[in-house]
Structures are given as C-alpha cells and as structure tokens.
Amino acid sequence: MKKLIVALLIVVTMVPALFATGSQEAAAPAAVAKPIVMKIGHAQPVTHPRHESLLKFKELVEARTNGGIVVEIYPAAQLGDEAAMLDATKLGTLQATRGGLFERVTPKMLIYTMPFLFDSLEGIEKVTMGPIGDKIAAFAEQNGLLVLTTGDAGGFRQITNNVRPIVTPEDLKGLKIRAPGVKTIVKTLEAFGANVVTIPYGETYMALKAGVADGQENPFVNIEVMKFYEVQKYLTIVDYQFHPDPFNVNPAWYKSLTPEYQKILKDCAIESMKYNNQLNKTASLKAFEVMKNALEVTTLTPAQRQAFKDKAMTVYAAFIAEGIMTQAELDEIRAVSK
C-alpha cells in the first residue's frame, strides 16, 4: 500500500513539470525568417561607376531593411550577356539588371538617344529622373519589366577609330564602326556615312584588335575601363548622344514584397543612381586624361559639330514616322533639359 501511495505521489509531482516543459517549448521564439535575396547582374567591370553605384545600393538596402533583403551583385556579364540578363529578369530567375539594351526594356527609351537632343548632363538627369522619366519608364511593364529609375550610362558618346582623324561626316565613309544593336545609334552612324557592324560589348576589344571593326563609339568611361584605347589611334569628341541606364526589376517579384520594402528599394535605387551619375562625371574626367595620352584627340568646333547635326536630322523624321516618339515629346524634353 505504501508503495502505491509513493508511486501516485511521483506521478502527481511529474505532471506539473511535464506541463511546465510543454509551455516552455511553446513559448520558445520562432526561427528568424530567411532574408530575401535580390540578385542583380550587369555587364560592366568592377571598376565602372555602374558597379560602384550598385555597391552603394546594396549598402543602403541592407541597412534600411535590417538585413531583410540581401543584395548579391554579379558584374562583368558573369550571368550572361546583357540580352540574357534582361531575359532572366523578365523570367524572374534574376531579380534585377541595369543598363544595356534599353530598347528591349521599352522602345520608348529610344527617345533619350536621339542625336544631339541634350546639351548637358544636368539636363539629362532632370529628364530621366523626373516626371518625364517616370512616364517613359511606365511603358516597360508592357514588356514584362519594371523600371525603378533611370540614370546616365556614362555620359556623352564619342567616336574612336584606328584609320584617320574624324573631322567631318565624310571622314567616316567606308569605316567599319562597331555599335550595339540600338536602332538610333545605327541610323545615326549610317547618316554620318559609316558602315555599322553590330558586336556585343564584351567582344568589342578583340574585334577592334583583329580589324573586324575600324572603330567604335562609347563614352569616355567605357573606352577607358574596357581599354578600347589600346587598340585605337584617334578620338573625336562629338558629344552626339547619351544612353539611359534603367534599373530593371522583375515586376512579380517586386510586387510580392511588402509596401515598405518596395518603397525602400525605390528610394535606394534613386539615391544610388544619383550617386552613379556623379561618379560618371568624375570618372569621365579621369578617363579623358588617359585618352589624351593614348590617342590623337580631335575636339570639333561648333561649326564642325553642326555638320554632324545636319546629317543626323534625317533620323528624327524616321522615328517620328515610326510612331516611337512625337515632336511634342521631343519639344518637352528640350524645354525641361535646358
């Protein structure tokens, strides 16, 4: 009998302990949710302002989300060329990409690249990062992309070659000039008299070295970081065009985020893109110093530059007729960019 009483006492004593243990387990903190990973790919090397500004974006986003979003950056076309990265962003296997092939983001962005449309980098930023830029960016969703903001891909574009100095449009006749597959560049260079060859950005150096192309066109920053000056002899400063640098994200992925996270990404994209634009200005000055020592430089006089402008005017008529832009839109850009 005594043994039975002792056994019952043991059971009674253990029951509260068991309940206490259960309640402690229930009160244990939930596991911390995994951070959201945002993979961003681009084609420029790590020394380019695009990469440096994306590092700034990463710093801002991870700080403002307290590590809730982790940004991974893949430079130098590690994830494929610009076309492949744009397609991956549309599919959602890549969350974001910047720059390059903006025509595929929306043909409306071609309006930025019309020859001699802008007179200053400050004017470019007013347009691309203002209400006009927002209206143009909105067209990207028709092509399965969402543009957080649009910046400057490197400043005004110049022409280099290894055959002769370019002083007049006639000097370009017969020269094979490499260009990306952007219609406005192709049409403009053809209007100048050049024979255009389309070659991927990452293959341009070897194409110039092998003579597949006689020359190319790019901003100072790109010419310097890609070392195109090593395989060229002449540089003509013509400031004929600039390229936009859209910050493209996958719409479904972006809209799956909380409104708070969406706002953080948008704000950080704008802040880092302004930083990008400033970096480009500084890098352009440094790159030009390299150009002066490596190439024979021709700076066009206003009268010489006007001859190129006159040749390029046919490009405007063609794209207005195609319906990509209107004269009213061009006039608005000119007015805002002053």
What are these regions (language model features)?
Residues V6-A7, L54:
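General helical structural elements
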Residues L8-A17:
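Bacterial N-terminal signal peptides
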Residues I136:
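Basic phosphate/pyrophosphate-binding loop/patch that engages nucleotide-derived ligands
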Residues S23-G123, I132, A140-K338:
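N-terminal secretory/targeting leader peptides
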Residues M1-L4:
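Positively charged n-region of N-terminal signal peptides that target proteins for export
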Residues A17-S23:
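Juxtamembrane cytosolic interface motif at the C-terminal end of transmembrane helices
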